Amino acid sequence: MDSDFEPKTLSDIPPERRPSIGEALLPILGVVVFLGVGSGYLGLAPHAPLLWSIVFAGLVGLVRLELTYADLYDAVSNGLIMGLQALLILFTIYALIATWVSAGTIPGLMYYGLGILTPEIFLPITALLAAVVAFSIGSSWTTAGTLGVAFIGIGSGLGIPAPMTAGAILSGAYAGDKQSPLSDTTNLAAAVTNTDLYDHIDAMKVGTALALGLSVLVYAVLGLRAGGAIPAGQVESIRGALAGTYATTPFVFLPLVVTFGLALYGVPALPTLVTGVFAGAFTTILLQGAQFTTAWNVFLNGTSPETGVELVNGLLVTGGLSGSAWTVTVVALALSLGGLLEGIGVLAVLADELLDLVWSENSLVAGTGIAAFVTNAFSAQQYMSIVLPGVSLRNAYDEHDLDSRNLSRAVEAVGTPTGALIPWHAGAVYMSGVFGVPTLTGSIDLANLSASIGGYAPYYAFAFFSPLALFVMAATGYGFVAKSDA
């Protein structure tokens, strides 16, 4: 996304087309009702409820705000353009995962990982390793789509539930991404708030360290509880199946080395991932003995290996490029909805209403975090959650003599990690797709007055601790930097 993008503020909207707070809440209520009834009650995939939400928001724009079809079209187009890189990365990651499975890269990581790790240390090690990789390459998505997929397999072999493993991967990946000078969101947060990049990173370090440390502690406790759950001989059975199906020499890690090497060198995400696809295809041919056409059919159609062990077969089934359709269409619909809500002025009105509730520096910083989360939920992409409050609240920080690094820290502490908690958000749809684990599931038993919650969200500790650290710092004033002292 272009960091020069500036979303509408209230002053940008002509008075005759400016939504009232009631009109702004109408589309928001529609989203909540349609997703709640459609996905929560009827059990539909999110596609139809998102489409209903888009149509309803469009009707509000046409009927109540007297916008034209061209206005609505432009708003939806802007939402899709903002998320275009995310959509292209989605296509590419699905192809990359398939070629890396066929190349033996992901099976190789599983093979060696199962020989080293134990259930007791697996989850904290996963979180820390994901943090190091994401910090090094500047991408939570790439970390999850490569290292993360392999660790889901390792965790399954060790008897660790996949939602726990997914939560640990995400905690580390987003913590590392958040602090990396190579990360797109880190650079974006600094750019839209007019903050020096390294001042922004420095302002986040205490909150990130605290949130990641608490997350690792949670995973250490979960790991102790998971210990001893492996059926006798399961690890060796899995390793034997992997070694019997794939060549597991260290050379199978060539695609991984090439991809991470390019990322460390600063090559943009898309060409890096495309190169990883080519490296995976050629490793499949050279090391696994596949025909040229077979390797490139995997790129399109995915893998369905027969290893002789059902658990391993299930872990290594991939959809390839064609398997990305479900995920990409959800993300495209969510981006369209987010662009429409921004374009008709709904998000600008909500941001302005937030400012009316600010009475101190402490409430401003806490309110910024809340604004980032609300924007994440209704725009369905983390870029908007950083850009909208980052641009809209700059003057408020000046008026309260707060340096811009306070603003950049607040929008990223909440905006970057929390998207993957929201089931229809682009980040959550992506992570759920690559891990094969739902973001959030739930059921209510009215007869017994009980409820259950599943998916990876309850185990994604960093997404809870990062905002919590920000709110504690906001309440105490810790880490505030006055503009006059900067």
Model-derived segments and spans:
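Membrane-interfacial loop-to-helix junctions in multi-pass transporters
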Residues: 81-86, 111-128, 156-165, 245-253, ...
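Intrinsically disordered, low-complexity non-transmembrane regions of multi-pass membrane transporters
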Residues: 1-26, 70, 228-243, 295-310, ...
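Hydrophobic mid-bilayer segments of alpha-helices in multi-pass membrane transport proteins
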Residues: 22-34, 44-65, 87-93, 124, ...
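Hydrophobic alpha-helical transmembrane segments of multi-pass integral membrane proteins
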Residues: 90-93, 119-150, 334, 347-350, ...
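Interfacial loop-to-helix junctions that mark the boundaries of transmembrane helices
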Residues: 16-20, 39-51, 77-81, 113-118, ...
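Core transmembrane alpha-helical segments of multi-pass membrane transporters/permeases
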Residues: 44-47, 51, 71-107, 120, ...
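Alpha-helical transmembrane segments of multi-pass membrane proteins
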Residues: 120-133, 159-175, 363-376, 400-428, ...
